[in-house]
Amino acid sequence: MVGCDSIPHGSGKREETVAVAASKAPPPRGVTVLLVDDQPIIGEAVRRMLSGEEGISFHYCKDASAALAKAAEVQPTVILQDLVMPEIDGLTLVRHFRADERFRDVPIIVLSTKEEPAVKAEAFAIGANDYIVKLPDRLELIARVRYHSRGYVALMERNEAFTALEASRQVLANDLATAADYVRSLLPPPQERGGV
């Protein structure tokens, strides 16, 4: 992929319904960071900050136009991204991530040199979850990455549990309908009442 690097740190219906629920991708475990920034020196600096941290894998994408494809590949639990990039500006990229069903809920932390309150407010208004001025302290960056990832993983686990519960409810409803049909088939046909 151009401009992106990874640094890995019963009834037939019943089986069908359960298979559909089981085919959903499980929620991500651990912390997977995707950094989108056109400056390789920033990519290297962030990689060094996160290296050695247990449970964190880091992926870097230099080309903002390849960011969605890279995100689909690595399934990040948090996205760090710059605002000023040549192909696609950072605010537009936030909009692209939020418009894509796959990444709608993935936390986005803007990592930028811009400190103006109006820029920060706009980033939050279009869907960024956090805003850090480059380059933050290592401990702060790790804390924010872990915090946002924890929230995202909890959301995915909740959604997975809800999907499984809904699939189970549907299986029970189908089983009840099948049982009701069977019981009705055992009953004698209704008698017509005639006049006496």
For the regions a language model picked out, list residue spans one by one.
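Active-site residues of response regulator receiver
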Residues: D37, D82, S112
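Active-site beta3 strand of CheY-like receiver
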Residues: V74-L80
